[in-house]
């Protein structure tokens, strides 16, 4: 499996590039608009074809790269079914699968930080967007956030995953 964690220091956003192998289909989670050229360069270096670009939620701290990636690669843009974003061509529900060649992610609805927050699990990893952060959680005081829903998402969904799950 190809797994690259990419960091945008301006917004503090982690993005993730995933594929089963060189020359395969790829997906990217939480792309930042200003980093689109870098993502495309990396995919070219790894001989990957972007087929899906995913946002875990509507972001207030950066402009999403979904639209630019769709326009430049014709990839499918993906978010959870509760999103109000208009750039989305595929909306997923809790319990759905997000599949590309050789890789499958499970979809978990994890509202709280926003009302459209979703997490994605892949083997021993979970991609939580801003639901869980390093040393904390995402804010709940804007974007239809709800502290009680976030508590429930963290303690009754995410912390119920296997103990060896990487966040």
Model region roles, listed by residue range:
Residues 24, 104, 114-167:
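Metallo-beta-lactamase
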Residues 12, 23, 33-109:
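Active-site HxH/HxHxD metal-binding segment of metal-dependent hydrolases
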Residues 1-49, 119-128, 135:
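Conserved beta-strand hairpin/beta-sheet module of binuclear metal-dependent hydrolase folds
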Residues 7-8, 110, 167:
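Short beta-strand
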Residues 18, 30, 57, 69, ...:
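Divalent metal-coordination and catalytic microenvironments
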Residues 28, 58, 139:
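Generic anion/oxyanion-binding catalytic loop in active/binding sites
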Residues 5, 62, 82-84, 91, ...:
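Residue-level preference for alpha-helix termini and adjacent loops
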